[in-house]
């Protein structure tokens, strides 16, 4: 894997763990407009930094200060932050001072929530964009698919991921995961209310990421909603090939005489839509069952490519 020729926009990845390392390999293998400029960590013995060095990527184990002090820092146009919500605020402050675009893979939520197939084009000029969460990247497109056909009163998602794919960063950010995903189900997905649940599944051998999406919407045309969901799934497959519907979309009409009680909204009737997803990872660095991590890195790469092609080239 040789570095891309000059003319590509240089990027830095902050965080040399699973997500950062997988993202690095994606940039090097599949980056159309991007080139690795730096891999940044805080553990000199991490596998991610060692792998980056072997691949010829400049590295530092001195964190954000080490990045700023690197000889090639002035060439960095985009930085991906794959650390933690707590660390991101400081990283963002430093990077903004130097005019570097930031793609945030933590649940820090400093910039607008972005899901590539839903709202990326609205936020191409934002200095910082937030990739929501793995569960958000998988499920928000489905809520948006229902929402563009029928007004969604409530959306609830359950993201089930293998315990093995949940590293220390994921585990430390569980509360942020649920809050961030719930908010983005509304602000990006279009639901009036949203709820997110994450399940760490300890099964061996590890299971692939599975997501269940429930929406309660105003009455709508079932065939139109199903077609919208299928079209959206195909759009996500454009950058996450392992994303798929596990079965046909299911519908249930909730009568006004037997309404569902929705927290914050009260008794509601309408059309309940149930969508079942599976996300298989591309296995660039992470195992195929870690689709939850793969969808984050794939979405971040898609955003960076679009930024590079539409904003940085201008």
Curated annotation (Swiss-Prot):
HAMAP family: Ac_ald_DH_ac
Chain positions recorded as NAD(+) binding sites: 16-19, 165-173, 292
Entries under InterPro entries matching the protein: Acetaldehyde_dehydrogenase, Acetylaldehyde_DH_C, NAD(P)-bd_dom_sf, Semialdehyde_DH_NAD-bd
MF terms (GO), sorted A to Z: acetaldehyde dehydrogenase (acetylating) activity; NAD binding
Catalyzed reactions: acetaldehyde + NAD(+) + CoA = acetyl-CoA + NADH + H(+)
Highest taxon of the lineage: Bacteria
Pfam entry (one): Semialdhyde_dh
Entry's family note: Belongs to the acetaldehyde dehydrogenase family.
EC class: oxidoreductase
Active site: 134 (acyl-thioester intermediate)
GO biological process: catabolic process
Keywords: Aromatic hydrocarbons catabolism, NAD, Oxidoreductase
Name by which UniProt lists this protein: Acetaldehyde dehydrogenase 1
EC number annotated for this UniProt entry: 1.2.1.10
Chain coiled-coil ranges: none
Gene that produces this protein: mhpF
Keyword Oxidoreductase: yes
